[in-house]
Amino acid sequence: MTYTKDALKEAIQQKLRLNYGCTEKQATDGEIMKACALALRDIMAVRSVDTQERTQEQQEKRVHYMSLEFLMGRSLMKNAYNLGILPQLTQAVEDLGFSAPDIFDMEPDAGLGNGGLGRLAACYLDSMTTLDIPATGYSICYELRIFKQKIVDGQQVELPDDWLNLGDAWLMPKPQEAEEIHFGGRVRTRWDNGHLMVVHEDYTRVLAIPCDMLVAGYNTDHVNTLRLWDAKSPKPIDMQLFSQGQYLKANEERAMADSISTILYPEDNHYEGKSLRLKQQYFFVSATLQSITRQHIQTYGTLKNFHEKNVIQINDTHPALVIPELMRILIDDAGLSWDEAWDITRHSVAYTNHTVLAEALESWPQRLFETLLPRIWQIMQEIARRWQQKVDDFYHDPRKTEKMAVIWDGVVHMANLCIAGGMAVNGVSALHSDILRRDVFRDACGMEPDKFRNVTNGVDHRRWISQINPGLDGLIRDCIGDGYLTHAGHLSDLDRFADDAAVLSRLEQIKGDNKQAFARWAKRQQEVTLNTDAIFNVQVKRLHEYKRQLLNVLHIISLYQQLQDDPNMDFRPQTFLFGAKAAPGYAVAKRIIRLINSLADQINSDPICRDKLQVVFLENYRVSMAEMLMPASEVSQQISTAGKEASGTGNMKFMMNGALTLGTLDGANVEMHQVLGDENMFLFGLTADEAARLRQSYDPYLLYTRDPVLHRVLDQLKTGFRDGVSYEDLYQRLLYGADCPADQYLLLADFASYCAASHRVVDTYADREKWNRMSLHNIARSGIFSADRSIADYADTIWHVPYKK
């Protein structure tokens, strides 16, 4: 069916009347935005029903993608784009007397995530839909998305950020499909005719209400669903307590249930926080599996073929309880034997690992399981016992048994649970997967080598090129057509235009226009004036020490000191842009944010630096900001310590938009280097193997004493800047360590190499033809990092499902 401008206009008007009791003349911008969303939702709902009926009739295998994070960003433009009606929707809004850009800008980011993990899940859901794979995403319907970051006196302050006020138009609550989750209580068992009968009693009940968000694919009628679970108590308010004036007590159970879906990643440095996190994870897993198995039984009448018709992909270890919960359903509810249930489970679940950091491998105290999840704890103990026996029989080595244990010394290790109960374990870049095999999970890989795979991450190139960068999209279409939108590999055809002066000139003009557009946006949003004649040198990502925002800062300090020494030196203007949120409990990361703002205040107020050097911290970095920033960026800083970044996806988005990478051979940078070569990116620093060897005898203090530039830069941390704040704690952390080894992430070891590479960036930028050619090569060779390719890899090697080629 074709949707014209007039048809959409009429649909929006109807939604205003039926849902908000007003006409376009009375409607607010927010009501117009929600009416647009409802109109698009109706289109997708019809297609969703058709998709479900087709999947049911053909008995197709289904993919269930479980992730505690889904950073969907804004959906109005994205869904309109995928449905092929963005121009018509834009004109319909304008005809109703509203500014389409203003209406699109009204939509809050659906920030149901913290960073790359959630954005990856969103990209993958888009690609699964575009490739016609029957898939459902699952997560929690958080009331408050990731916090809103406010910078006050240079420091991060976290504010609650309610997205549902305007974002709920996309959600379709389905209370009739609610699931009941049980916490606490006690478990009784008895044998009856050779079968173990399990009785769970005296538990606390929580209802999981599904709220479905429809996802349209590009150039297809296929529509998939993101199912978000909202937690509610089934108990009404205690009227007796309420009538006695005990208002809080009367609402206690309701409040406890509501807290499960209030916020992503509650602080867990205390028992209550850990308890709430574990409740969140089990709530999410149990609701999802009950829903999946119920649907499967309705179709097939049995769970014995569950693994033949379903595959569950868990995005990191947060949904790892899917393994014992599926066992519980198969044994307790379906009456299968342990061996039958285990065979089904280990052929149903696949695990994606996203970290090599030991501290990030999730673990839980045993007592939490015993208290909150008594039946799951029983099943976990049996899984752990059988797995430990298998490891013992294979290795006969107590050290390996301990390292691979699911439960050891009162601690539950979730990654080991995923390995024990999963059919596949994949890393997210070639280097990362190699490190998992050789180091992190070496013993498990030695025992079950066929279980370990690699699927390099990818991003939704339609969103991150065509939708957000229409100028570049137009250039690509003029050069090679629009086939790249469904076959990203076609981007390689751009390479043949590398010596076309007109194409390179147009590419430079597009970048300049995007810089101007972002500067206007930054002025409106943050009242900052950017120097658009400067190189836009960008580092935006979650704030973590291994991502080394501090290394970037040290280099900027050295540039500032050079200008102080010689204000008249030849200095190509640079604007350094940072965007990062620190986890609320991560004190060191928060200190680095304050340091960036102290440095920015010093440099931006010093007349010596005017029109030469600028530092800006972009407040509240989010998906919609990235969509403005990435087309305008010229240098992409991907400078993590080699061997620490699993993959990264920001690096891919910058590459697709023609920014040149300044980076280490880490994560997906390695594969970028394979397609770009030394000549099209700026590499520096130690390799992962070199970093591992250096740590055995590393002394950062020696570097401090031998390098006068580094010495002076670090001393500046102690002195601080004009705001009077000293950063001696960071100085001490780098040189002597604190609760960690000195310079744990090798900033000082890579400092000189990083400065030299940064100098090469500036020198190369002066040769505009060369720079633009390098930029074109980056765009041309970025197709391998499309999420479509990633999903095809999963479909071929792990899920074994067909997809649209």
Question: Where are the model-predicted features located?
Answer:
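A conserved ligand/cofactor-binding region detector
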Residues: 1-805
